[in-house]
UniProtKB/Swiss-Prot annotation:
Pfam families: Ribosomal_S5, Ribosomal_S5_C. Belongs to the universal ribosomal protein uS5 family. This is Small ribosomal subunit protein uS5. Its main location: cytoplasm. Residues 75-138 form the S5 DRBM domain. InterPro entries: Ribosomal_Su5_D2-typ_SF (IPR020568), Ribosomal_uS5 (IPR000851), Ribosomal_uS5_C (IPR005324), Ribosomal_uS5_euk/arc (IPR005711), Ribosomal_uS5_N (IPR013810), Ribosomal_uS5_N_CS (IPR018192), Ribsml_uS5_D2-typ_fold_subgr (IPR014721). The lineage of its organism: Eukaryota, Fungi, Dikarya, Ascomycota, Taphrinomycotina. It comes from Schizosaccharomyces pombe (strain 972 / ATCC 24843).
Length: 253
């Protein structure tokens, strides 16, 4: 009598089908190589731009989130809230999910992403990408004597969204973050260690609350304190400087 095949193998077994699905799924999980589609992305991948501060200096728009991943690999994200939103249609109410995500490296860079999608996971994934595209530098300063590393906001700044107003006030070293949980987590991801905050309005609306905090923190980079008054030579933008290289790379892509 012929020996029977092991269970799960051979014709009619279930083992082969499971292994086949695993191999197909592994290909989907493989990371694809980044192929830049913008001029800024091609310069970044070619190594012509050394830091993300050069992009901010010339106010170049970031259209690819991979540029942020290239310069800031240690970004952390925090899902602040996911709320269902509805839209009335002829077929009835269409429910979608709106995600608010704050992303930052705790070292002077923070972004806010908001995205709506039919599924929660898709909304969070899209909000993370939007947060990377909207990432902004945060200028830090001192409360008193300039000793050690910058630890607080350089000046008083305010941000407003809807009825919510958030004010950030410099604090002495060791004071910590005197803020609501939403603003506190936002400032932690921004890299601010000590800060007093004031908030007014309907702070229960978390979306407007975190938007106002982001608007206030973004203003710190637009204020020049006396130590930044020195004149600096302002040359061509990287896109103008490396125009010849961009013409060559366009043919490759």
């Amino acid at each position: 009598m012929a020996e029977s095949a092991p269970r799960g193998f051979g014709r009619g077994g279930r083992g082969g089908r499971g292994r086949g699905r695993g191999r197909r799924g592994a290909k989907r999980d493989e990371e694809k190589e980044w192929v830049p589609v913008t001029k800024l992305g091609r310069l970044v991948k070619a190594g012509k731009i050394k830091s993300i501060e050069e992009i901010y200096l010339y106010s170049l728009p970031i259209k690819e989130y991979q540029i942020v991943d290239y310069f800031l690999p240690r970004l952390n994200d925090e899902v602040m809230k996911v709320v269902p939103v509805q839209k009335q249609t002829r077929a009835g109410q269409r429910t979608r999910f709106k995600a608010f995500v704050v992303i930052g490296d705790s070292d002077g860079h923070v972004g806010l992403g908001i995205k709506c999608a039919k599924e929660v996971a898709t909304a969070i994934r899209g909000a993370i990408i939007m947060g990377k595209l909207s990432i902004m530098p945060i200028r830090r300063g001192y409360w008193g004597t300039a000793l050690g590393d910058p630890h607080t906001v350089p000046v008083k700044v305010s941000g407003k969204c809807g009825s919510v107003t958030v004010r950030l006030v410099p604090a002495p070293r060791g004071a910590g973050l005197v803020a609501a949980p939403v603003t506190k987590r936002f400032l932690q991801l921004a890299g601010i260690e000590d800060c007093y905050t004031q908030s007014r309005g309907s702070t229960k609306t978390l979306g407007n609350f975190v938007k106002a905090a982001f608007a206030a923190a973004s203003l710190t980079y637009g204020i020049l304190t006396p130590n930044l008054w020195a004149e600096r030579p302002f040359g061509q933008t990287p896109i103008e400087e490396y125009a010849d290289i961009l013409m060559q790379t366009e043919k490759k892509y």
